[in-house]
């Protein structure tokens, strides 16, 4: 295939991010309403479903074994296709077992894609351009999320689309983009051949520790921050939706700039700033009683997520270039260890005292 000017690895990463977001944002936006209205879920069933969703993330290290039989770029397309199919058919299985199965399929695609995307990003991007491009990928994903939310609002408010139709469109768009990428882009070669076995190196210990803490921080935010907004501060559905909208608008506008800043000041300073900021935000959550200030903390909490790209660029600088693929799977597994115990253990702490 004759390579055209737009057929670049960076553009492929952008389209991959859009495809993933079209499917995953649709699934996330519809989940709670669909499982309650159509599948009659209680807390028990939604807890099981969320646990099932995390299993593929915990098993992400197995991606390296699949790379023995399929190239990484093709594996990314296949993973996006699985994500798209899982979302597209979700509306046709309004039962506990049906949703458990479609969720697992969707999650396998999502977590394998995220694993391979990290590996490909660090292989294709130079050390100089990686922070800026990774920030722009977050911005593009946020813009795609805004498009999904706007479409969902119009589709349900004015055209009364069914759940089945919306799931089909969200997952189908991801599947179609996967096919377009497969047909429209050449196979990009990695400068360094990748090792196809599991690797744990002592000199990567700090990267593993940062990855684990990043997973713990993600669980605290995704599981408890929104719950706190509703239970303690009385936020309505529209209030929560407004917070989501503001978060994505900020990411769209500033994530690329944050990536540039990381490249300029370095990973050490960026992560130090993030963790100091998170310490202040988490401490303030325990003492703030005003709903508006709580919303400000929620937005700041989310904004700090963008600085986490410094963990990836730090690894890119210290790692053997041949370790990118194998370490990406190990890192995702480490990141999801926290998902096993934090929701349950911190949930029990919540029952004693939310301020703790």
Descriptions of predicted regions:
Residues 43-44, 127-137, 237-238, 321-331:
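Loop-to-transmembrane helix entry/capping segments in MFS-fold secondary transporters
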Residues 75-88, 269-284:
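Structural signature of the two symmetry-related core transmembrane helices
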Residues 29-45, 223-240:
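Short amphipathic helix-loop junctions that connect adjacent transmembrane helices
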Residues 152, 171-190:
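C-terminal membrane-cytosol helix-exit motif in multi-pass small-molecule transporters
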Residues 154-172, 348-356:
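A membrane-interface helix-boundary motif in multi-pass transporters
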Residues 134-150, 334-342:
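Glycine-rich segments within core transmembrane alpha-helices of 12-TM secondary carriers
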Residues 60-72, 156, 254-267, 350-351:
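Helix-to-loop junctions at the C-terminal end of transmembrane segments
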Residues 112-125, 306-319:
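Intracellular juxtamembrane helix-capping segments at the cytosolic ends
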């Amino acid at each position: 295939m004759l390579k055209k000017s737009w057929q670049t690895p960076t553009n492929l990463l952008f389209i991959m991010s859009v495809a993933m977001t079209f499917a995953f944002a649709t699934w996330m936006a519809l989940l709670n309403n669909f499982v309650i209205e159509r599948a009659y879920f209680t807390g028990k069933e939604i807890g099981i479903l969320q646990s099932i969703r995390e299993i593929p993330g915990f098993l992400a290290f197995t991606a390296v074994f699949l790379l023995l039989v399929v190239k990484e770029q093709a594996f990314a397309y296949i993973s996006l296709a699985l994500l798209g199919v899982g979302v597209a058919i979700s509306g046709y299985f309004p039962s506990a077992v049906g949703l458990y199965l479609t969720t697992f399929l969707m999650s396998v695609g999502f977590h394998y894609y995220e694993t391979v995307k990290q590996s490909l990003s660090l292989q294709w991007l130079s050390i100089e351009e990686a922070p800026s491009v990774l920030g722009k990928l977050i911005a593009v994903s946020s813009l795609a999320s805004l498009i999904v939310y706007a479409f969902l609002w119009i589709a349900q408010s004015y055209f009364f689309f069914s759940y089945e139709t919306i799931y089909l469109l969200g997952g189908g768009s991801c599947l179609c983009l996967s096919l377009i990428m497969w047909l429209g882009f050449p196979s990009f070669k990695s400068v360094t051949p990748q090792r196809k076995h599991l690797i744990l190196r002592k000199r990567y210990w700090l990267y593993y520790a940062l990855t684990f803490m990043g997973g713990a921080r993600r669980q605290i935010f995704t599981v408890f921050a929104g719950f706190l907004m509703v239970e303690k501060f009385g936020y309505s559905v529209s209030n929560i939706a407004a917070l989501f909208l503001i978060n994505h608008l900020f990411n769209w506008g500033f994530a690329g700039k944050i990536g540039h800043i990381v490249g300029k000041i370095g990973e050490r300073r960026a992560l130090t700033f993030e963790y100091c900021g998170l310490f202040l935000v988490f401490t303030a959550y325990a003492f703030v009683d005003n709903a508006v200030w709580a919303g400000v903390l929620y937005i700041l909490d989310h904004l700090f997520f963008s600085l986490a790209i410094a963990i990836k660029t730090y690894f890119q600088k210290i790692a053997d270039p041949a370790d990118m693929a194998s370490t990406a799977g190990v890192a995702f597994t480490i990141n999801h260890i926290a998902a096993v115990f934090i929701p349950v253990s911190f949930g029990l702490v919540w029952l004693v005292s939310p301020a703790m």
